[in-house]
Each structure stands twice: as structure tokens, then as C-alpha cells.
């Protein structure tokens, strides 16, 4: 990811140049621009199919929807990756003055698990401080992501605000003008890099000079800036200005208040309302010569994303200044041994997998306000088909109170209409317990039990409850009717912990009080399989207060035995223990305490010795680190049933429905 430090307004050229340099080395590279200008010079939207307009991004941020914004960026990125099949993607960081660009760039970088290339304007010495400021948004992990830097545009002309401007006046040996600061005629020095005194904090991949030819305007661009009428070739380009028809050159624009008899100018601007054909392109405006000249003094040096010719030529120009050896090594450097699953990427993956599963999920607490709001979002996003239990009129009244709409994609079930249907089947399933029809009718008064019977009959594909019911109320019917899955000796519960850079799996944090070694081994295996199913590379740490053989005690012995059993049962999984939590997640601690471990320092799945430990750690991490925890997700049932915290937010319910739909889809395979 090219990370702008300050107003690095040559990012478009730098990104195109790096892509071209990578392609020259045989890489299948492309560029991804998360945001693009709202409109091009013609006033039309110039965003590519993979970019969001900056105006739309501002709306997301103004509405407090930063997470949704990053997920939308991820969706565009994944479509680009799928359509292009690129093995290297150069992400162009965001330069913006309407929101905190450093904060958004950090969020995008972490979501994509991208490496960083800081891009700075000016000499390397000045760039040092700019890089440090920008990297401050990435925390301790930022320095490990930097793979090089780029310097650019030190000699570009700028306006009073520091914005790069296009100077169209006079002539120079480069064929442009005398004051443009252009390096276009200079032979590029391949691999030009930082020459500042002292040690540079990053290896410079390129030092790209300014070239005004990269920003040569089209006649259509000029017409838009001048708000004039264009006749002729809209794509003819200019990089100079003349006020004399006789001396005007073919690369210049002639500004005049009279129709010239003849001129070599590429574009003629007729002022004061004068009209008539002249030059390859003619722009007619009611403005005076002086006003037009004033407008030309304020032209920004930009390349619009719809200007394919300039995009290509600017990339070819910039590519000459990249160090070939360093560029060749970039693809290898960026290939990660242990790629991270960021929270944004995880949420996006949940949504996509759930949509693909296309399942009906029972929500027995159908008139509970948070559940109603979640159902509306689930249906709108096509995550699943929510099935709400209760009187339809009452549910719709709640929806109206909450300001949401339950339209197409939401189903309603009135329990009174269907309870009797499931009495015989429930009696049959519980006959060994002596259940009578009267008992069955009493049990089916509970909507959770009723929904569980529908799940058993394959009339819905999963069940989510717990917003107002206890965990026991949610799980007991499933254990009595659904039973455990083939090969599962117990049901366990995990939480997905959405840490800043990586999603972890914590288990068991909700069900098993004091599991023995065999049960812990099963929990470890179930949790590893769950992690893998949700796109997380499982590296399982069996957690206790000691690492390896450094300590003694019942929990150490328990986790040592559980680790051995899990490894024997599933040699294909990466499982290690006992490990302390810090040794599991911190590479420097792991290097000291468990240097030979394949898990220490890079664990993604954490198995705790007891419910007391697991629940305490999950809540401590959730609250102290302000981490989103999704779950508990139940493992080991024959069909997916998931419990909610009674303090669950609407987001929690939405993602729990998504998880349940994904589980249902996996059970079909």
C-alpha cells in the first residue's frame, strides 16, 4: 500500500509507475484505488467499477459507519482481485482533506493485511518526520509492514496551499514552459534513491521527479474549467499558453478575443462571447481574456482516472526511476508466511459466505426490538432469510417503532398456528423419557422449543436465540432434540475475538465447566476446524500459567495431556502446549520461552483449561482492549443453534445469524 505522508499529491503517478515496474519484472500487477474523485473535469463521475467516490466515503464517516466503509472497500478489492487474477496489487492510499486520511489509510491497510510503502514529497531528511507521523496510526506493528519508500515531486510548482499546480506560460527546452519545474527532458537515473545525510529509516525504491507532460490537459478538461462550449477534438492536449496567434505552437493553447486568421495552436480559447472555428479545438466563453488567464494560473496538476492515455504514459515515465533489484524483490517480500485475518476482512467473509449459503434462520424472539432490527438488516443484505416467530402485526408494530422496514426477504410464523403439528414428533423423540402429549404441548409453548422442532424437521436451517432467554433455555431443547453431531462427544462454545489486526478464536468460554483432557482435546479440534471453516489459519495454543516444562501443577499436567491427545487424534493440525498467553501471541516472548514451537508467537486459536479461565479472559480482553466478540458459537451439535448474550447489540445478532447460516451451509457438504 502506498501510504501518503502529508499531502503526497503525486500518488497516482507513483502507483502507476510501481505497477509498470512490477510488470516489467514479470509480475501480474494491478492498482487498486479505494476512493476516487467524485467528478472528473467534465463533471461526470470518474470512479472505476472498483472505487468508491470520496463523496460517498465522507457520508459513511459522517454517519459513524467507518466499519461499513472499510467492508465496502474490501468488497471492491475482492472483486478486483477476482476479475484481474493479479498476484500483486498496489493499493493507492487516500489523500483527503475532508476526513482523517491517516486513520482511514491505517484501517484499510490493516483490513487488507497490506505491506506499506510511505510516499513523501521533498528531500529524504524532511520525509523522516512525515513518515513517523503517518506510521503513528499503525502502532507497534507498523514498522514491520514497511518494505520501502518513495520520494516524489520535490521540484513541482505549488500554489499557496501547497497543492501542485500546472503552470502554462512561456516556453522551455522541454517543450513545455520555463517555470514548470519540469524534469521531463532529463535522462532518468534508474534506481535513484535517498541521498540525505544520515541513515534513512526506509529503503527508497524510487525518487520520482516532476514532469509537467504527465499532467498535459485535454481540451475537454480546459472547457470544463472555463465553463465554455467546446467544438472539435476534445482529446487534443496542451502544456503551454500563448496570447499571440502568429507565434503559438502546436502544443499550446491560444487565448484571444478575436478569431485568428491562422494559428498552429492546438486549442483556441475565444473570449468575450466571440464565436467561430479556429484550431484543432475551439472553446468559446463569455469570460474576458484576463479572467481566462486568471483561471489558467489556478489549474491543478492532476490526472483523472478516466484519462487512460495520461495514466499509461505517467506510469511509464515513473517506472524508469524505480530501483529494478528492489522492485524485483517486492513480490517475494510481500508474500506472507502467516497472513492475518483482520476484523474487517472477517466480517466481509462472514457476509459473503452467509449469502452463498442462502439459509432460513429461525429467530424465536421475533418481537424483541433488537432482533427485529437485526432481521431487517439480515434481509436487506441477503445474509439469510430471517424467520420471525410471533404475531405478524405485533412484529410490524415493533419494526415501525424502531424505524426499520420488514419487507421482502423476511418470513413470519405465528406459533399458535403450528404448535399442534409438532406434538406427535416431540412425543416420539422423548418417549424414552416418558413425555406425554400434554407435556409436549406445554414445552411447545416456548418458541425456542418450537423453533428447535422446526429445525429438527429441516423446515429451517439454523436457530439463534438468547436476547431475552438464558443460555440454558436456548441450548437445552437442542441437546434434547437435535443431539450432538456424529463423532462429537460434547458440545462446546467459542468466541471470535476481533482484535485490531487479527481475529482469534477463544474456547471454551461458555459451556464446559471443568473439561478433562479428552474433552479439552475435542474442544481444541472442534475449534481448529471452526477457525479453518471461517478462513482463519488454525494454530492452536493450549493455554495455562506455564510454558512447556517451566512450571508444575494440575492445570499444567491437564493441558500437557490434552495437547498430546489432540495431536494424536489430528496430526494434520498445528497444536502446541502448554503455553502462556503472552508466549502464544508475542514473537519476542515466544523466542525466549518456546523457540522451537510452531504455534508460539503466532497462535490464532486459544483453548483454556476451564470455563472460569476462558470466560474471564474473554471478558477481560473484550472490555479492556475494546474488542468486538462474536459468539458464543456452539460446536458439536447436529444442526446449528447459537446463543446470544442478553446484552447483545444489533450487530452481534446480525453476525451470529451469519455464522449460523454458514454452519448450516457447511453441514450440507
Each language-model region and where it sits:
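Flexible phosphate-sensing "switch/lid" loops adjacent to ATP/NTP-binding sites
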Residues: 1-282, 286-335
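Anion-binding alpha/beta catalytic cores of soluble intermediary-metabolism enzymes, centered on
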Residues: 337-600, 605-669
